[in-house]
């Protein structure tokens, strides 16, 4: 049964990668415009062609995987095109690439690393209403400030700093997922599985919650990249509070699962998140 599930997840990983790359082939769109098609017309035909191809090739549930991965690849490709455009939106292109890669890589790494927990939710596209509102708010702020204060969006060194924060956060989070292996899950577990072990090596030797640390700096980095002063502050406060509560919730389960072993680990290794110590234990 486990071998069959791994084989299925491997197939789903390959499917997602193939369709992500298919979506990213929108990078060839400039060739179509040079051939005489108008930009919007070419884009509309391209999107219609992709959807038709996916409908012909796949049936549910594989179509559900394919359409999501293809969409993220398409967004990534558009982000690359925007990044190289001669406009005040080029740094937004960096953001679009970072966002699409984050969501796609969450699914791909889960498929490779912990196939038993793989689902469409692994894309994290339906993370929460708060996440959606936060993303929309950052887009609105960028758009308005780009209209009224375009020079604010052309601070390249600041956007580059944000990009470095995003890359660091992404790499740390994925390192945490690979290190934890089947112990990693997007949902805090309330029951210990037979294969659940306490991971204290690799990046977990540096901090207790490296996946949260990575996501924390990734989130703030996106707003630094966009030069969004309002959302930058709001994101920092919001994600700090979120991870403070999430860390405490998770550590209650970990103490229940591993007892003294986790308490000893907790004493030795910090959370990695600024001013967050984790759940308080009364001795």
UniProtKB/Swiss-Prot annotation:
Give membrane topology per the record. Answer: Multi-pass membrane protein
**Tissues in which the protein is found:** Highly enriched in adult cerebellum, with a low level expression in other brain regions.
Report whether Oxidoreductase shows up as a keyword of the record.
Answer: no
Q: Which Pfam families match?
A: ICMT
Which Enzyme Commission numbers does its entry carry?
Answer: 2.1.1.100
**Where is it localised?**
Endoplasmic reticulum membrane
Name the GO terms of the biological process aspect.
Answer: bone mineralization; CAAX-box protein maturation; determination of adult lifespan; fibroblast proliferation; in utero embryonic development; liver development; methylation; multicellular organism growth
The alphabetical list of record keywords is: Endoplasmic reticulum, Membrane, Methyltransferase, S-adenosyl-L-methionine, Transferase, Transmembrane, Transmembrane helix
Q: What does this protein do?
A: Catalyzes the post-translational methylation of isoprenylated C-terminal cysteine residues.
Protein name per UniProt: Protein-S-isoprenylcysteine O-methyltransferase
Q: Identify the gene encoding this protein.
A: Icmt
């Amino acid at each position: 049964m486990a071998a069959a599930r791994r084989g299925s997840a491997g197939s789903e990983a390959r499917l997602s990668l193939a369709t992500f790359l298919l979506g990213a082939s929108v990078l060839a769109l400039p060739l179509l415009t040079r051939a005489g098609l108008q930009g919007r017309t070419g884009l509309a035909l391209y999107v219609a062609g992709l959807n038709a191809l996916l409908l012909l090739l796949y049936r549910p549930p594989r179509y559900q995987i394919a359409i999501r991965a293809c969409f993220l690849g398409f967004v990534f490709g558009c982000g690359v095109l925007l990044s190289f455009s001669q406009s005040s939106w080029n740094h937004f292109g960096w953001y679009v690439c970072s966002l699409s890669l984050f969501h796609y890589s969450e699914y791909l790494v889960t498929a490779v690393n912990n196939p038993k927990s793989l689902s469409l939710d692994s894309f994290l596209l339906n993370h929460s209403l708060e996440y959606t509102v936060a993303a929309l708010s950052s887009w609105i702020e960028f758009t308005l400030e780009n209209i009224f204060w375009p020079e604010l969006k052309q601070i390249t060194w600041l956007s580059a700093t944000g990009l470095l924060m995003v890359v660091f956060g992404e790499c740390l989070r994925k390192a945490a997922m690979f290190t934890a292996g089947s112990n990693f899950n997007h949902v805090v577990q309330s029951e210990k599985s037979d294969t659940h072990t306490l991971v204290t090596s690799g990046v977990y030797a540096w901090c207790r919650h490296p996946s949260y640390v990575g996501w924390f700096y990734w989130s703030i980095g996106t707003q630094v990249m966009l030069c969004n002063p309002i959302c930058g502050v709001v994101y920092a406060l919001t994600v700090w509070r979120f991870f403070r509560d999430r860390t405490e919730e998770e550590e209650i389960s970990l103490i229940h699962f591993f007892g003294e072993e986790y308490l000893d680990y907790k004493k030795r290794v910090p959370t990695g998140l600024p001013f967050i110590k984790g759940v308080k234990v009364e001795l």
